Amino acid sequence: GVRAITAARRVVVTDEDLFPAGVLSLHGKEKNEPSAALGTVELNGLKVYDQEIGEALAYAEALCRAAGSQLTPLLLQLMDGQVSFRYDAHDLHYYEDGGIDCTVRGATVAMGSAYFMKKRRIALPRDLKMETGVFMTVDGRLAAIFAVKYLPSRNVEWALRALRRNRVTPVLATRGVNITPNLLKRKFRLNARPIYPGVATRLALADLTAQPGETPNALIYRDGLLPMAETV
């Protein structure tokens, strides 16, 4: 086990490793919330275009649930008590340029980064200043903008530094359309030099991390990237 661990030069890292969910926050930290319970992904607001807000949220939740997105519990919190219906997504497709689309009740619903939308020639507001916004279209028309914010965790920063110091390369198995090497560099103020495979490889690796593997080489008693970094 020790030999296998010390020989490891790469480690698969998921969305949850980089930005632990904890208690996901809709509008940031509330005064009476303990800091330890806060997550590192926030939904700070949304703007809806030419859609009923309930309909837009139902479309977004259906796609995010099918994609295994970290935004799903945030959207469910937002819908709780306001939107009584749920939709299901079919024919999910992922794209290399940072987006996903699917079919929901016969409509083509797409969600992705600003870059993804520009590649699809979707007109976005000119005064928009959101590095990690998530945009949604329905049948090719802008339907909603979600202000998503990623908050860097000190433990994750330490873990990334430990991996680099020990010459272990992170392999990103991320589903989030905005979780890229550039985002990590901005948020954690270091170049972790991760490997960023194509979308099909990232999804396959993410699925593998959720499955039981072969004979374990170590037991890790705490969740998160830092205990794993300390082990390898």
What are these regions (language model features)?
Residues G140:
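Flexible loop/N-cap segments at domain edges
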